[in-house]
Design a protein with these regions (language model features):
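Second-shell loop/turn segments in exported
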Residues: 26-36, 63-66, 87, 98, ...
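Short helix-loop-beta-strand segments that form the rim/entrance of peptidase-like active sites
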Residues: 221-246
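His/Asp/Glu-rich mid-to-C-terminal helical/loop segments that flank catalytic regions of hydrolases
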Residues: 221, 339-369
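Metal-dependent peptidase/peptidase-like ectodomains
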Residues: 238-338, 354
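Bacterial Sec-dependent N-terminal signal peptides
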Residues: 1-14
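Noncatalytic luminal/extracellular "stalk/propeptide" segments of secretory-pathway proteins
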Residues: 29-125
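Soluble metallo-hydrolase cores and metallopeptidase-like ectodomains found primarily
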Residues: 87, 95-101, 124-205, 221, ...
Length: 369
């Protein structure tokens, strides 16, 4: 089977690039919860699974669950001393739970209004989703890249609407290919991203994680025409990762499969790059070590990526909720090219997934053998 997989891999870049670019297109609205971008993306993924003749799990490939969300409605505007500031580039909204004492202390100035706490700063924090902060009315604070101005209410003019929605229904997308045994290899990725700020700004999320989603679908495509499979192959695409591993946590708590029969779960997140190789999170776990050694052996003899970096476990992607249920690891690419992390520049045009893809998929699919 490995020979079949390797021989077919050279043709895979077209499909994986096509899917990455479709998921990172404006019509997906950043795959967030404003404009129901998550549902648009989920339906696209579901239709791909149908085309590939995967068998459904859940409710016709969908596993529904609810979560509380926040998002920015309409086009936000913010002026400081009459000057219009650009969202993301000049200011960023951060969920209130991220606010730390040292952040306040390091801010050059601050101003509390009825709706927001504004902070003047010399460096903006990473863009993240707006996750509700309990029952508090104030859900987020605003970092402004302007440390020199002493802010006063009369100098600050804003029109920013943050919508909070409880029990928003979203979904994981899950399908499988039956094998000769009920032992399973599971491939996962999250398809959600940061969404958009009205019509003024979109986080396309090509690297994070349209690329990983496309890779999972391409593995399904590759094996959908090669029978019989030694193992049952399961493909899980999660929403809610950016909001705190919500989709994968729900899948772990409400299993659609018997995790005791999973040989290995491989989570794929951020694959537009790869010029420097790959990293494996949870590589040092005793249950994962045999698979890591297998990857190193294949890389040394066949794929020859520059590096396979081994990392200890961390709650930084969707493998983590499953680590107590089965052997689970998280693989991501090292190096470029890609357009940035949690940035509007993370678009299809900046994604270099095709450049390093043949050896990447050769290596990953070797785990199925």
């Amino acid at each position: 089977m490995l020979g079949v997989a390797i021989g077919a891999c050279a043709q895979n870049a077209d499909y994986v690039t096509q899917v990455t670019c479709r998921l990172a297109s404006p019509e997906m609205y950043g795959r967030g919860y404003d404009h129901h971008g998550d549902s648009i993306a989920a339906e696209f993924i579901r239709q791909e699974m149908i085309k590939l003749k995967l068998k459904p799990l859940g409710d016709n490939y969908l596993q529904y669950y609810n979560l509380d969300i926040c998002y920015i409605e309409d086009n936000p505007t913010l002026k400081l001393k009459g000057k219009s500031l650009r969202p993301y580039y000049d200011y960023r909204l951060q969920p209130l739970w991220r606010l730390k004492k040292e952040t306040l202390e390091k801010s050059k100035w601050n101003l509390l209004t009825e709706d927001f706490l504004f902070l003047g700063t010399s460096k903006l924090g990473e863009a993240v989703p707006l996750v509700p902060s309990g029952d508090q009315k104030l859900q987020c604070y605003v970092e402004i890249l302007n440390p020199k101005c002493k802010a006063k209410a009369k100098f600050l003019d804003y029109d920013i609407h943050v919508v909070r929605e409880r029990n928003y229904r979203t979904q994981n997308v899950v399908g499988y290919l039956p094998g000769e045994s009920d032992t399973m290899m599971v491939f996962t990725a999250h398809y959600d991203h940061l969404g958009s700020w009205g019509d003024s700004l979109c986080f396309f999320g090509a690297h994070d994680n349209a690329s990983g989603t496309a890779l999972v679908l391409d593995i399904a495509r590759l094996y959908s025409t090669t029978y019989p499979h030694r193992y049952t192959l399961v493909f899980m695409l999660f929403s809610g990762e950016e909001a705190g591993l919500c989709g994968s946590s729900h899948a772990a708590r409400n299993p659609l499969i018997d995790y005791s029969k999973v040989k290995l779960l491989v989570n794929l997140d951020m694959f537009c790059g790869g010029s420097e190789g790959i990293a494996i999170v949870n590589a040092t776990d005793s249950l994962c070590q045999p698979f890591v050694k297998q990857l190193i052996a294949v890389n040394d003899s066949i794929t020859r990526l520059p590096e396979i970096k081994q990392r200890t476990n961390a709650a930084n992607s969707d493998h983590y909720p499953c680590t107590s249920l089965c052997p689970a690891m998280f693989i991501y690419s090292l190096g470029g090219p890609y357009g940035g992390y949690h940035s509007p520049a993370d678009d299809c045009q900046s994604c270099g997934i095709a450049q390093n893809y043949p050896n990447m998929i050769r290596l990953i699919t070797s785990l199925i053998e």
